[in-house]
Amino acid sequence: YQLELCPSLNPHVGAILNITPDHLDRYDSFADYAAAKARLAVQSTICVLNGDDEHCLALAEEAQNVIYFGTAPTMANRVAEGALYIKNQKILEVAELQLNGTHNASNVLCALLMLQALGLEPAAVLPALKRFPGLPHRSQTVAEVNGVRYIDDSKATNIGADEEDFPDPM
């Protein structure tokens, strides 16, 4: 809904991580929600899109310049085999991040691609990324007791995202 508050937003680089049935209490339909996110793709000079998300892929036709990322082994920008790749070059091992979940590795990759689109070198921020503990209440491990890992994700708005990003039994 925050995009609605910025009708004249025209970023040089924008990104859409996913479009899932969330925040539907604010919209008449999922199509209306997707249209609100689509505006970002259209208004961005360069748009970084999640190539794993069918709804994001549908936006590509409307966007000007698209950079894709995802998890498919055929994607040049991907999270796969325990690492982040940009243009098929391994740049970071996922295990070097302090963040839980595949979604966080994908978020990091998206941010690195946005930096690159702005003309900055992703390698310059890798040391900081390795130290970043994440935000409070966002997929944070709080304890591990008798082989059970306890994760605080109390800021999450979509349980489906947690189910997808934490393949271990919950």
For the regions a protein language model found, what residue spans apply to each?
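Nucleotide phosphate-binding/pyrophosphate-handling subdomain across enzymes
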Residues: 94-170
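Beta-strand->loop->alpha-helix junctions that form or flank phosphate-binding loops
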Residues: 50-51, 64-81, 126-130, 140-143
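Fold-independent oxyanion-binding glycine-rich loops
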Residues: 18-19, 50-52, 69-72, 88, ...
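Flexible active-site lid/hinge loop adjacent to a nucleotide/diphosphate
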Residues: 1-62, 68-69, 80, 92-99
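Structural motif
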Residues: 13-14, 46-47, 67, 140, ...
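Short polybasic amphipathic segments
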Residues: 82-88
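Residue-level detection of beta-strand-connecting loop/turn positions
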Residues: 88-89, 147
